[in-house]
Amino acid sequence: MKQVDRNVRSNDLSIAWPFAFTSVQLNRDTSLLKLIAMVTMLIDHAGKILFPQLPFMRVVGRLAFPLYAYCIAVGCVYTRNPLKYLSRIVLLALISQPIYAVALRHTVPSMYAYSFAEQPLRAAWAFYLGSWNHPSILVSLAAGVVLITTLKEKRISLFLGTALLCWIAQRYFDYGWHGLALMLLFYLCSNTRWLAIPVLGAYMIWWGAQGTGYSLFGLKFGIQMFAALALPLIFINTHSKMRMSQIFAYAFYPAHCAVIWALSEFLLK
């Protein structure tokens, strides 16, 4: 009996893992945030391919990634099945990659090394493999899910190993390690509003200050500075009660790439 009491007291004194969050204090209106992310991403990609003479479209597009990154962090907090959540993103990445590569003009000569008329299977395989020369943002989002989940579930060795691999392979991620770090910061700050505002604000300003091309009051900064404009949407609870179809949310990415490609073929040729 005494042994049991000692075990109970020992368990009571154990320290809970501080990164296993089960709730979010920041904006939980992720359907609205995803919609804004979709629209700004569409504007960004349309500006890059269809309207390069309108640079403000690329500025508007800077809001998309922080919103998606935040939604990934919130998804990791609330998902009951992290593996299923990750699998959906990976499957979407596998399906979308060739469409993305063609639409956003990330093609390479190896994609067209074989004739579809003469060697259709080999040509299709070469086309698909070559499209991965510049992976889409979905690969970064999938890596973010792995990093957050391994940290949340206290799999420290796996977390550190994944972080090291991501650091080594950062050239294959949109936004490099900066984007992966942002997803981690969103997760770590998601349950503490007073910490989120200064930490995320400082990080976004620091990130934007790394580039050039813009200036204000004599201070030079890059286009990524405009991504900080997404933070108020994340910090303020909007309560729109909007519900977005999961199918629509996932299908939008390859669909918008296909539309941009079709328009570029019709309008620019």
Residue ranges and their predicted role:
Residues 1-269:
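Alpha-helical transmembrane segments and their immediate juxtamembrane cytosolic regions
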